[in-house]
A protein has these predicted regions:
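Short, surface-exposed beta-strand/loop micro-motifs that present aromatic residues
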Residues: 341, 348-357
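Short, surface-exposed loop or secondary-structure junction motifs
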Residues: 90-336
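Hydrophobic (often cysteine-bearing) scaffold residues that line and stabilize catalytic clefts
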Residues: 5, 9, 61, 65, ...
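Active-site SXXK
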Residues: 8-14, 28, 34, 60-91, ...
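Short, conserved catalytic-motif segment at the N-terminal edge
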Residues: 2-61, 81-83, 97-106, 239, ...
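Generic C-terminus detector
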Residues: 368-377
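Short, well-ordered beta-strand elements
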Residues: 40, 352-353, 359-369
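Hydrophobic "anchor" residues
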Residues: 36-37, 234, 361
Length: 377
């Protein structure tokens, strides 16, 4: 990257922090197949304090976790230990007990029925199993309230044993599916998901700052979460996911740094090859990057908890699909991303994209709630 382009990129970060109500701190990086060619930071780790945010600052990466969990599942597929068409109940019998929400009675109590078919691993990977999130579904939130079901952020198994909002395979709906995928990986490997990731992703890629449980070194570099009030003002929020978690949440539980995530992105850009070992076969990466939905499209989300997320959609009006497990832009975007580019995000306004066609990818990381915060767009 030449100096002019670096200055332009740096100014985006600086302006994001400097503007009224802007992000307290941001880290952004861009990589090609070989190495990062842009690294930028601006701001502080916590609003009201002076310690600057740095390239090695640790973030709660939330749903950026999903791609790594999906990778551990696809490794099982490569080894012939599972098939995407397998019923999930074969590995996690508890999932067969989850029923479909069929409305509420006059007392606000859920009316439930059995699903019309078993949930498959494929449906979990593609977000078509029927699960939602309490902060993206009024019905899911009402069910949890009526049944006093734990929140998904409790990092407990009970937090994902909620309800199906539609029958398996009926439509695309973003939800706790990858948490169940993580349970499948644990059942097959006989280890916690974090151990599997450590052995099969983090070690081969040299990702030394990624974990479900913060190490003392990671905690010393942790960037604070912040919340934006209705008046637009930001304030630090002293929230850390349960340490250690009862369950390694495959949908949202990882902490990590941007440099670590760039190593994962480079592995995908290099068709599964890491600097010291192969993590995935080329054919697997190609499958992960292709649409797996049949007759369905992925879309946006509607908030049911405005403190955690705004309503929104990535690239509204453009056709989008879902792979294993990324969103895919099926059409070129106004910002110049080609059709077939894969991407996703994390709840605290973290965003990543992987352009395999042109061999580049990047990440933008902040720690602000609600999702789709104005300072991150």
């Amino acid at each position: 990257m030449n100096n002019r382009m670096k200055e332009a990129a740096d100014s985006v970060l600086t302006n994001t922090v400097a503007e009224s109500g802007g992000a307290p701190g941001v880290v952004a990086m861009v990589t090609d197949k070989r190495a990062n060619f842009y690294e930028g930071t601006a701001g502080v780790r916590e609003m009201g304090k002076t310690k600057p945010i740095a390239t090695d600052s640790v973030f709660a990466i939330f749903s950026c976790t999903k791609a790594l969990t999906g990778t551990t599942l696809m490794q099982l597929v490569e080894e012939g230990l599972v098939s995407l068409d397998d019923p999930a109940r074969d590995y996690v019998p508890d999932i067969a007990e989850i029923q479909v929400l069929d409305g509420f009675d006059s007392n606000g109590q859920p009316k439930l029925r059995a699903p019309k078919s078993d949930i498959t691993i494929n449906q979990l990977m593609l977000h078509t199993a029927g699960f939602g999130y309490e902060f993206f579904s009024h019905d899911d939130l009402a069910f949890r309230t009526a049944r006093e079901t734990a929140s998904v952020v409790s990092s407990t198994y009970d937090g994902i044993k909620s309800v199906l909002l539609h029958d398996p395979g009926e439509c695309w709906m973003y939800g706790v599916n990858l948490d169940w995928v993580g349970k499948i990986v644990e059942a097959v490997r006989g280890k916690r998901l974090g151990e599997v990731m450590q052995e099969r992703i983090f070690n081969p890629l040299g990702m030394t700052d990624s974990a479900f449980t913060l190490t003392p070194a990671m905690r010393s570099r942790l960037a604070s979460l912040h919340t934006r009030a209705e008046d637009g003002q930001l304030a630090p929020w002293d929230l850390v996911l349960p340490q250690p978690p009862e369950m390694d949440m495959g949908g949202h539980g990882l902490y990590g740094t941007v440099p670590d995530y760039m190593k994962f992105i480079r592995m995908i850009l290099n068709d599964g090859e890491g600097p010291d070992a192969r993590v995935l076969n080329k054919e697997t990466v190609e499958k992960m990057s292709r649409n797996g939905l049949v007759g369905l499209q992925s879309g946006g989300w509607t908030t049911s908890m405005p403190a955690l997320s705004n309503s929104g959609e990535f690239f509204p009006g453009l056709k989008k699909s879902w792979g294993y497990t990324f969103q895919i832009n099926d059409e070129p975007t106004p910002s110049g991303r080609p059709a077939g580019q894969i991407m996703w995000a994390g709840l605290a306004n973290l965003f990543y994209w992987i352009d395999r066609q042109n061999g580049i990818g990047g990440m933008w990381a902040s720690q602000i709630l609600p999702f789709k915060d104005i300072s991150s767009y």
